[in-house]
Amino acid sequence: MLDVRRLRLLRELARRGTIAAVAEALAYSPSAVSQQLGVLEREAGLPLLERTGRGVRLTPAAQNLVRHAEAVLERLERADAELAEARTGLAGALRIGAFPTATRAIVPAALADLARRHPGLEPMLSETDPAAVAHALRAGELDVALVHSYDFVPDPEEPGLTTRPLYREAMYLAAPAAGPGSTWSAEKAGPAPTPDAPPGQDEALRAHRDAPWITATPGTLCHAMTVRACQAAGFSPRVRHRVDEFATVLALVAAGLGVAVVPQLGTPGPDVPGVALTRLRMERRTRIAFRSGAGAHPAVAAFAASLRSALPPGLAGRGAGA
């Protein structure tokens, strides 16, 4: 009988490529990973790994075994969810990951609702960048998380994980309002938009092609979104400041130090002192992520329900099409 824990190691090796990466991700020593994979090889009765210089490569038999391992591990997640549902009451830890704007604007109310409905649950929140969620879920560091994607930044394929839509939000071009010391004023963006009729996105962005831009740090989805949106409008942004916190981004914009693209939840409201907000046609889509098979787990389902009940009025009901 093949050992499930060793199958998990083989699956991680298929994803990460090296024994060292598997060891680091799962907090094992490389020698322990090699030893357990050797035992799995004996259990299988076939070679699973081929040496390639300093690394290893999966044999065709191992690749086939990984496909079966994916199905087995998903079924185990479902079994765990059904067992949890059969127990009376929800209790125990629920490890939650969320990105900063959701952590500020939505998660506190959701956790308060969850505590009222299920006092036996112990939610544990970690602020987590969406780019790190897949690893944290697979490693068992999180049970459920919020991730987001933007126009121009497609969702990556994440085998073994499932996502469900939560909400969409509008995106805005933030520019300094007209006034003393404002070099890049709102006047360049044209007439003020209405919620139902935003201006042409390319025109709004091109109006500030010569402005200094404020983006998130490279490697983040927010950075890629801004750069690709500008490129689609026909120019590359001249990035001067790299800041991840949207409150700081808006403070820099208000000081006349540049322009930026920000999501709806990244603003305190439609009126930001010193900042002109121009709605764009692009959106940010937020989804609930969990390991495949775990969606029916009562704790995960309860948190998802609390999230939906906590959505601000401007976002409520928008998840179905996200």
Q: Which ranges hold each PLM region?
A:
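Short helix-boundary/capping micro-motifs
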Residues: 12-29
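Secondary-structure junction motif
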Residues: 148, 181-187, 193-233, 296-305, ...
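Beta-alpha-beta core module
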Residues: 155-165, 169, 247-295
